Amino acid sequence: MSDPKFIHLRIHSDFSMVDGLSKVPPLVKKVAAMGMPAMALTDFTNLCGLVKFYSTAHNCGVKPIIGADFTLQSEEFGDELTKLTLLAKNNVGYKNLTLLISKAYLRGHVQHQPVIDKAWLVEHAEGLIVLSGGKSGEVGRALLKGNQQQVERCIEFYQTHFADHFYLELIRTGRADEESYLHFALDVAEQYDLPVVATNEVVFITEESFEAHEIRVAIHDGYTLEDPRRPKNYSPKQYLRSEAEMCELFADIPEALANSVEIAKRCNVTVRLGEYFLPNFPTGGMAIEDFLVMKSREGLEERLEFLFPDPEVRAKRRPEYDERLQVELDVINQMGFPGYFLIVMEFIQWSKDNDIPVGPGRGSGAGSLVAYALKITDLDPLEYDLLFERFLNPERVSMPDFDVDFCMDKRDQVIDHVAEMYGRDAVSQIITFGTMAAKAVIRDVGRVLGHPFGFVDRISKLVPPDPGMTLEKAFIAEPALQELYDADEEVKELIDKCRILEGCTRNAGKHAGGVVISPTAITDFAPIYCDAEGNFPVTQFDKNDVETAGLVKFDFLGLRTLTIIDWALGLVNPRLKKAGKPPVRIEAIPLDDARSFRNLQDAKTTAVFQLESRGMKELIKRLQPDCFEDIIALVALFRPGPLQSGMVDNFIDRKHGREAISYPDEKWQHESLKEILEPTYGIILYQEQVMQIAQVLSGYTLGGADMLRRAMGKKKPEEMAKQRAVFQEGAEKNGVDGELAMKIFDLVEKFAGYGFNKSHSAAYALVSYQTLWLKTHYPAEFMAAVMTADMDNTEKVVGLVDECKNMGLTVLPPDINSGLYRFNVDDNGAIVYGIGAIKGVGEGPIEAILEARNKGGYFKDLFDFCARIDLKKVNKRVIEKLILAGALDRLGPHRAAMMASVDDAVRAASQHHQAEAFGQADMFGVLTDAPEEVEQKYTQVPEWPEKVRLEGERETLGLYLTGHPVDEYLKELTKYTSCRLNEAAPTRRDQSLTVAGLVIAARVMTTKRGTRIGLMTLDDRSGRMEVMLYSEALDRYAEWLEKDKILVVSGQVSFDDFNGGLKMSAREVMDLGSAREKFARGLSISILQSQIDQQFFERFSHILEPHRAGTVPVNVYYQRPDARARLTLGTEWRVTPSDTLLDELKQLLGHDQVELEFN
């Protein structure tokens, strides 16, 4: 290959996030395909793509040049920011580049972008080559302004600090001022003997990608393409030009080309990838391996005393634990990971010592006895046949990876502790990148192209909302999208542009749980990224790249369920302490509690971790789990693979004796597999069983068996052929028939695809069981904790309040005197609604209220409440929300009176606060001790009707708490219905049942065949029922399919096999008005003689008038002390008896004097 004539030294990938269109690997591969031996990646103030760039470049035979584009601020230019590019000449330069990037984010945000200070440039100059930034750099700006003195000062700075490492950059991409700058620059270069270099400031691969890049920039900047104000900073010529094109472009300045090659030769950085660097763990001078052994043995002793309190039993069981511990310790120490285990041990122990709940384990880590001994996990791996080699395989070197669950509320405290222990500059969270996803990219590109919202919305709604959805998958999943694409040229154009942009890096954020702990400063391994305020620093390498770069990742995950358990125990244990009883230790509860398993078998698992979905409840009812092993199996079985393969049916039938148990198949089984498969009734359910079968039958080591399990998962034909031979040979050596061995191998291979990690299943089954146990033994406290965790999700709270009622628990409205921010439990065992769940109140006002209550005791009334709180924090709107929610019910006569008195109470309180602030002088100038108490006088107004009161609760709480909209109609509904919902029973096909209730959920769904079905849930306070409306019924009654309506529905009732309970197929649907017209014989109105005055009949006819032309006769009963007469109004006065009519008549005459008459 001949010597290169040009090398690209300024290329952006999509990691530049503002500009740059291409992913790093395709970019590098294109450079290699063009025959270029080197390239520089210079993303804007970041090295996010470095690991991918360095690895891909080496694999493609391209020399990677590491650099970045920067924005620079200096006294010379004041508020005007300039550009420059820095390339790492050597490893010192690479470190300085990393430090400059980190400083720009941590300390240098100006005008919403990371910026470096010129003084930092001097401090970190060693090993860096500077490209001047072309017309946007300091020299370029000064030249274009014609400021010769500024030009001289700038050149003097770079010649002083960068000597022969500063190049004037020349760019020819057809943008404004480029040629003017270029001529000036060449003159200056000659005058000051400065080298020049040609670049193309590449932001996309091909010229055709220009429009897509313009769209990307417009999305970021918030413009449409046609907006005349849109800045046009880019050119179609900023593509990856070939060497020949660049040579032709700069044929008149050959030294600019030659210098690009010269710079490429000067840049030689070696990045160490694929090694691991752990921080030093303090061991008090002991060898770290010995320290791990000591801690593990001490911990195992404690565990054995807990597991086997009887010394004789303990002595008998000890050898197998000691042997397993030694095997694991040998592997951990040989592989060089003792520090990893000790680091995890320390922060978990610190968490437990500081009352921060920690999960019992997660993933394959629960298979380690060392982890159990060090209290990293809380499940005995020998008891449940969990394998260490599934976690750490001595035959496949990779870092161990403990995922640790912490209470959501306190997880950040643990990260803060780790930063304190190892040094804040050595601990960081990890970056994660948001990309342009299928649905969002359609909306963004559509907006930028100026399409109407409706047009774009129609297309984006055809993309399913599933996680990981791509345009390619969407075309397969939704045929209508393909039809639209083929039929409409505008749609095709939009989608084609979206395809180019889909998957582009859009923004950076913080990974959910990843934390790295470095042996030295993080910046020795990766640059830092953070927000515009310099907060939340994260590594610029993502979770995979940061490990490749040598840093060890620890996953600090937040698990909401641990928070719920913690809150529940926070309610339970103080009460137990008060009663002189020992506290509940959740890690010590028995795993065979009969009451808990009875609730489980009845599928009373709403709010129980992992076991609360409809499908899971159905599986529980079929399986009837009666031991902890069955809960482990439940977690593993409830996945698409086992459910679709028939494995679940076999498992259930074998458990209940409907199918013979074989190990694993009645035709092909072996006695040695019985012990492995007995807990799962002969079904190969877990990955660990796959490994054990290979070990027992064919003599695999467990490390080798783990490799087999992985190979089976990947299904590579050559690898599988190799493994089959090894399996058969090993089996025959063990005296197993070769044909039988191959049949078992086939069965193992089949089920390996569905196999689940038992360690993870067991650890999470333990959390499931703990929540089940709490729900069983401390139901009020548990449900209060669950509702607190979900208080921001009104829909969920509504369902949980219903579950409380099903459990026989009382849920009281929020109460300003006995309530807390969270849901809590009063002395009578009733759940008090959390004040924090009231919509529109917020944490600040509640804190202020609780502070006033703690300081001065319970509030006496509304006036006392307003006088004692800080009205700047708790304003009138908040007080009104509290009244509507019922939180002030104990402070006044009724909600209507308090709402009418709010203004007076706030005014009086303001005067009271002013008097407090200035002091009160009496007429003789003597200061009194305190202002007078606020006078309490409620505005006299009638109490709200129940409907208004309940609507206030629904507005603020999201549900009806002190009543139900159905209540006032219960007597009337008996005239239309066959029974209440809780009395309904299945009917024959030719029979109908009529029920009524409030619609609490309604939707229309489309089946896979394209059929539309209406679904609604009726609630009459006695129970609920799912109602289906098929084809004709849906067409006829679609308008009634609306939430919060009271409907009367007739149809066939049957068992709901999927959800349990009953369901109805609707034949007729009526709202209350229609039902009244159909069933009511008349509207009875009683008028007393004393009620009649001169205006009475005018008011009476005024109320009836809007409701005439109905079908129900009006029967007026006139009553005086000595006689009663009935008068039926003429047919022209027949009415439609709506709620409005009935309410207005009741207000005029009285509640008991208006009612519907039925046969």
Swiss-Prot record:
Subunit field text: DNA polymerase III contains a core (composed of alpha, epsilon and theta chains) that associates with a tau subunit. This core dimerizes to form the PolIII' complex. PolIII' associates with the gamma complex (composed of gamma, delta, delta', psi and chi chains) and with the beta chain to form the complete DNA polymerase III complex.
EC number in record: 2.7.7.7
Xref: Gene3D superfamilies: 1.10.150.870, Bacterial DNA polymerase III alpha subunit, thumb domain (1.10.10.1600), Metal-dependent hydrolases (3.20.20.140), Nucleic acid-binding proteins (2.40.50.140)
GO cellular component term, pick one: cytoplasm
Subcellular location(s) per record: Cytoplasm
An example Gene Ontology molecular-function term: 3'-5' exonuclease activity
Keyword Nucleotide-binding: no
Name this polypeptide is given: DNA polymerase III subunit alpha
Signal peptide: none
Top-level taxon of origin: Bacteria
Gene: dnaE
Chemical reaction(s) catalysed: DNA(n) + a 2'-deoxyribonucleoside 5'-triphosphate = DNA(n+1) + diphosphate
Annotated source species: Vibrio cholerae serotype O1 (strain ATCC 39315 / El Tor Inaba N16961)
Family membership noted in the UniProt record: Belongs to the DNA polymerase type-C family. DnaE subfamily.
